Amino acid sequence: ISMIGGMNVQMLARSQLGWDLTGSSLAVTLVGVGFAPPMLLFSLFGGVVSDRFDNKNIIQLGQLGVIAITTFIAISIFTNTITIYHLIIVSFFQGTFWAFMMPARQSIIAELVDENQLNNAVSLNAAGMSLTTMVSPAIGGLVYHYFGPGMTYVLITFFCIIAIISTSM
């Protein structure tokens, strides 16, 4: 849940930061769309990888990648070196990580519960993702408004660290 929360906050923050940096709706569009092509291109491959390798390891590698991205963006913001190009490139890489994490995340549910509990587990996972998708951008928007983009990326990184710790258990 914390990883999905971090992703949702990041999507909001990345778009708002793109606007703040450029004042261009085209730039915001490029930042937002950058996530989609790798998701489309690599998700099928991510499913194959998920079938052949340990899903927990795939998820953790993706989480480490996202932590690296959010840390890089936070440092770039605090050092005033952030550019719109960073956001576009990072959006692409985040989409790539998620193209591998999502199939592994879906597959791992079946590994964690008995077959007779699978429908409930999938439903609970979907409900958790929906709730997180609703609440996280509100939290992220408030943090961005009151504390700025740098602290928002610190929050995102914190969410991702919680996720990798949770996945390690």
Per-range role (PLM):
Residues I1-M169:
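Alpha-helical transmembrane-bundle signature of multi-pass membrane transport and export proteins
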